């Protein structure tokens, strides 16, 4: 059973995760990109699975367990959109876990893509595979959301050219991050070919409420 998830940041009111992914898919359809191709399914309190929903995938062709990606961690966010600008939809999942280089449990960002494969029955199907399972971004990650290319020429920095003008088809991942001195920043990250890299600050060195307001715009 798919459960709708919601962000639990204090004093932050955002759309449920499933709804936000659906909104991303609707925006993608308006730009000629394919409809939503992923679902996040909850199997227990701390076990989730990212599954491919595009094409001819169904349980008879090997099932979600064979074609999806298992996430045995708490999940705080789920978004979909074209991260690397290749014209196909990717999945962004926020999980709470430690990593090899940062063993303390914290909010992380995983990015997944679909690839062509074969089910256990030998039939063609879509499989979910990781693009990036990064240890961390720049600061202490609190939340993130996907910004489609058409949305990135925002009014927070009018000096930047629009993505339509530059021809950049990559979406941005907008991150709400805290710092070691208890301040907050909102930053944009873009795909660099082998992971996410810092692109620009939207706002920095501010209190939590100001950062949340900017992040939510």
What is each residue range found by the language model?
Residues 8-16:
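Bacterial N-terminal signal peptides
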Residues 19-217:
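Beta-propeller-forming repeat regions
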